[in-house]
């Protein structure tokens, strides 16, 4: 079975397609994030509508908003902590994989 060497144009086309695929993936993630953000805004407004009743004072409405803000800030803090924990675990796994790769590489060289 004979393997054919890809032409320079084939390599350029492959790189172009791969870069386009990555760009599309980033754009899709960006659009999905915008969708999630706007869905959250709609939900927030729905929640706010549930709490605000006719005849409420401005102070009562401001109290509700302040309470909601505190709740959301607490959630953000929790997500920041969770993200840091996940990042640490990812770094630890990367280090282990690197060590395993180095061991496999040295075993292959000694054979």
UniProtKB/Swiss-Prot annotation:
Q: Does the keyword Nucleotide-binding apply?
A: no
Which Gene Ontology cellular component terms are annotated? cytosol
Q: Where in the cell is it found?
A: Cytoplasm
Q: Which superkingdom does the taxonomy of this entry point to?
A: Bacteria
- InterPro entries, alphabetically? DUF496, UPF0265
Give a yes or no for keyword Transferase in this entry: no
Coiled coil region boundaries: 14-41
Transmembrane stretches in the record are: none
The record's keywords, sorted A to Z, are: Coiled coil, Cytoplasm
Please give the HAMAP family that the UniProt record associates with this protein: Pole_loc_TmaR
Q: What is this protein's function per UniProt? A: Pole-localizer protein involved in the regulation of several cellular processes.
What is the similarity comment for this entry? Answer: Belongs to the pole-localizer TmaR family.
Q: What is this protein called?
A: Pole-localizer protein TmaR
Q: What is the lineage of its organism?
A: Bacteria, Pseudomonadati, Pseudomonadota, Gammaproteobacteria, Enterobacterales
């Amino acid at each position: 079975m004979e393997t054919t060497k890809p032409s320079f144009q084939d390599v350029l086309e492959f790189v172009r397609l791969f870069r386009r695929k990555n760009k599309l993936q980033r754009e899709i993630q960006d659009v999905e994030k915008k969708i999630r953000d706007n869905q959250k805004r709609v939900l927030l407004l729905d929640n706010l509508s549930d709490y605000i009743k006719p005849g409420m004072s401005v102070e009562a409405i401001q109290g509700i908003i302040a309470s909601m803000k505190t709740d959301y800030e607490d959630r953000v803090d929790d997500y920041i902590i969770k993200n840091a924990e996940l990042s640490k675990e990812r770094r630890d796994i990367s280090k282990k994989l690197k060590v395993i790769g180095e061991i496999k590489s040295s075993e292959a060289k000694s054979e």
